[in-house]
């Protein structure tokens, strides 16, 4: 069954103290619903973009590490779920609930494996 990333985005100036107890309970309720449906595989919030590090391979083969996110934008990923869903429509239905519970914009992307990890590389040793 396909898996999907359901991400939510928060503004750079997001204040965690603005999250109410009611909002947290709505998010917890959504997580419980996802678990009961067998859809949720993983979920978490992530540190603010200002604490991110970006890594880029250089022409000399070394890796340059810099402060901050890769892209410059006013919104950054604030958390995400990994969901198993029958199709994109089912993943979008969960994402709509997430957008309501978190009160922030979101994004859905199918996770791709070439080939799927359980299938191996298909190459013999």
Residue ranges: model-predicted function:
Residues 1-125:
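Conserved, structured core segments of small domains
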């Amino acid at each position: 069954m396909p898996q999907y990333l359901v991400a939510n985005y928060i503004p750079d100036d997001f204040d965690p103290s603005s999250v109410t107890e009611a909002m947290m309970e709505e998010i917890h309720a959504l997580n419980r619903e996802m678990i009961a449906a067998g859809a949720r595989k993983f979920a978490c919030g992530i540190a603010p973009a200002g604490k991110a590090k970006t890594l880029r391979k250089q022409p000399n083969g070394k890796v340059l590490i810099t402060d901050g996110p890769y892209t410059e934008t006013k919104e950054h990923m604030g958390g995400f779920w990994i969901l198993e869903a029958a199709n994109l429509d089912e993943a979008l239905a969960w994402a709509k609930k997430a957008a309501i519970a978190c009160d922030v914009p979101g994004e859905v992307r199918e996770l791709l494996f070439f080939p799927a990890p359980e299938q191996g590389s298909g190459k013999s040793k």
